[in-house]
């Protein structure tokens, strides 16, 4: 992935957003996991180890989505490794397919920042920040309501 700057071990930010993230205080893993500015996108069926926030930046002006993964059950991690045939963080399970689709010209949210930390063989925590696709809506907003 081009145009990313490593600002800490395992923590990368797109070069266009480095100053903006520093102004927001998003310049360390601890800061990313403590960040609460923006709109909390919690929902009932979201796994307990996932947290999502939508926030905006001014320079460049953009709407961003922060997905954080922490305290991931070991069984979930092992299943991901088996399915992907390699040790992979939960964040990378989001990042890698999106980047492959982008290479084929399919419009996916642009990755702005990402990071992962390991504790021994298992993932400690990871995150990904993506940019909202202009004029897009989430699938949940377009699906019929299930009235069971």
Where are the regions a protein language model picked out?
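Juxta-kinase regulatory segment immediately upstream of eukaryotic protein kinase catalytic domains
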Residues: 1-43
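Residue-level preference for alpha-helix termini and adjacent loops
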Residues: 3, 10-11, 113, 132, ...
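Conserved ATP-binding subdomain of kinase catalytic cores across diverse folds
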Residues: 28-139
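Proteins with a high burden of low-complexity, intrinsically disordered sequence enriched in S/T/G/P/A and R
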Residues: 47, 147-148
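AlphaC helix of the protein kinase catalytic domain
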Residues: 138-147
């Amino acid at each position: 992935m081009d145009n990313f700057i490593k600002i800490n071990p395992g923590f990368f930010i797109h070069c266009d957003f480095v100053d903006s993230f520093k102004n927001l205080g998003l310049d360390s893993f601890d800061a990313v996991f403590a960040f609460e500015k923006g709109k909390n996108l919690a929902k009932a069926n979201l796994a307990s180890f996932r947290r999502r926030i939508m926030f905006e930046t001014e320079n460049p002006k953009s709407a961003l989505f922060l997905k954080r993964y922490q305290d991931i059950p070991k069984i979930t991690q092992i299943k991901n490794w088996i399915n992907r045939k390699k040790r992979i963080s939960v964040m990378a399970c989001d990042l890698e397919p999106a980047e492959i689709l982008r290479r084929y010209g399919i419009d996916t949210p642009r990755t702005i920042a990402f990071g992962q930390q390991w504790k021994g063989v298992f993932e400690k925590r990871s995150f990904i920040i993506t940019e909202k696709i202009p004029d897009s809506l989430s699938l949940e907003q377009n699906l019929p309501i299930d009235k069971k």
